[in-house]
Amino acid sequence: MAEVHVIGQIIGATGFSESSLFCKWGIHTGAAWKLLSGVREGQTQVDTPQIGDMAYWSHPIDLHFATKGLQGWPRLHLQVWSQDSFGRCQLAGYGFCHVPSSPGTHQLDCPTWRPLGSWREQLARAFVGGGPQLLHADTIYSGADRYRLHTAAGGTVHLGIGLLLRHFDRYGVEC
Amino acid sequence: MAAASPSVFLLMITGQVESAQFPEYDDLYCKYCFVYGQDWAPTAGLEEGISQIASKSQDVRQALVWNFPIDVTFKSTNPYGWPQIVLSVYGPDVFGNDVVRGYGAVHVPLSPGRHKRTIPMFVPESTSTLQKFTSWFMGRRPEYTDPKVVAQGEGREVTRVRSQGFVTLLFNVVTKDMKKLGYDTGPVDTQGVLGPSLPQGNPQ
């Protein structure tokens, strides 16, 4: 079987209006993919930046996949949340990005969005916080049910991902 | 004796902890160590180091230059657990006690070549107001008992941090027998090496 190593970091996020941010992340793959070692989901620390407006998480990712096919190439999905001084959490953005398919080092910028909801919900979010969230997290990385949503832009999550491929040339796959 | 089918690959890292930007602090020193997986073992060089105390430059850069060498070689059979360098920066507080001014970690670049990395440095924060007050009153900041936790992904959801500086690292990476073991590391990149050699405020 061909092997893929995904080694890198969720560096941080820019462009969010909230200041104390953290990120829940996960990786979704097709049925032909098997995770040999590493954790496929996690949550970063909460960062309150003192200089500049970028929140830094430096969250390490180290995953080792074996695959029998190319279908279902890994997708990273992200949820950015903000935490206020009382420890309450509010959704700031959803986003996903495909793990790059060429070996080497990649800088990824993942744009995010959040559901808007009705005008009542928007008004409530502006005054008391909270706001609508997705019931099914798979909407983040699948395109199937998106057409029903009305969304607003969030900030951008920055990732530095290195990719190592093994035995792809043995099967004639050019990445 | 060059074996026809090697089972081990080597990763040689040279480089330096070049400089740092900490707008609020001065007279800092830096410790580094490496964190790596079970299949990895160092074969040569030093995997820990502690730098001199550097003061800020008296110019617009306000740079803390350490110019501290890194030279280590690892061997492994599996890229999982690829080495990360963990940095911790310390400096004196108003009473002259050494307190931590930042932790940071980054993976050693995967592909051979020359790489520059600017890594954000953060300190843990007290979670409760009472702890905040006592740490302010006693003049003791929260610290990690083992700095190596910053290289781990698990258990982070309980920590709150404050990022307050950057350290610039330079790596020269050489690998041996990765190709023979069937790994494709991609093209040799020199990402971020071009351009000025000292950090220019906040990297994006």
UniProtKB/Swiss-Prot annotation, chain A:
Start and end residues of each C2 B9-type domain: 2-118
Residues annotated as signal peptide: none
Location, primary (coarse class): cytoplasm
Coiled coil: none
Gene Ontology CC entries for this record: centrosome; ciliary basal body; cytoplasm; membrane; MKS complex; nucleus
Known function: Component of the tectonic-like complex, a complex localized at the transition zone of primary cilia and acting as a barrier that prevents diffusion of transmembrane proteins between the cilia and plasma membranes.
The name this protein goes by in its record: B9 domain-containing protein 2
Organism for this UniProt entry: Mus musculus (Mouse)
Gene this protein is translated from: B9d2
Swiss-Prot record, chain B:
UniProt key word Zinc-finger: no
Keyword vocabulary terms for this entry: Cell projection, Cilium, Cilium biogenesis/degradation, Cytoplasm, Cytoskeleton
Annotated knockout phenotype: Mice display impaired cilia formation associated with renal cystic dysplasia, as well as ductal plate malformation of the liver and polydactyly. Additional phenotypes, occurring at varying frequencies, include randomized heart looping, holoprosencephaly, microphthalmia, cleft palate, ventricular septal defect and thinning of the myocardial wall. Depending on their genetic background, mutant mice die between 14.5 dpc and P1.
GO cellular component: centrosome; ciliary basal body; ciliary transition zone; cytoplasm; membrane; MKS complex
Domain C2 B9-type, chain residue ranges per copy: 9-127
UniProt-listed InterPro entries: C2_B9-type_dom (IPR010796)
Superkingdom as given in the UniProt entry: Eukaryota
Compartments it resides in: Cytoplasm, Cytoskeleton, Cilium basal body
Transmembrane stretches, start-end: none
Coiled-coil region: none
GO molecular function, one term: hedgehog receptor activity
One Pfam family hit: B9-C2
Subunit structure: Part of the tectonic-like complex (also named B9 complex).
PANTHER family registered for this protein in UniProt: B9 DOMAIN-CONTAINING, B9 DOMAIN-CONTAINING PROTEIN 1
Family recorded in the similarity comment: Belongs to the B9D family.
The protein's name: B9 domain-containing protein 1
Organism: Mus musculus (Mouse)
Lineage: Eukaryota, Metazoa, Chordata, Craniata, Vertebrata
Gene name per UniProt: B9d1
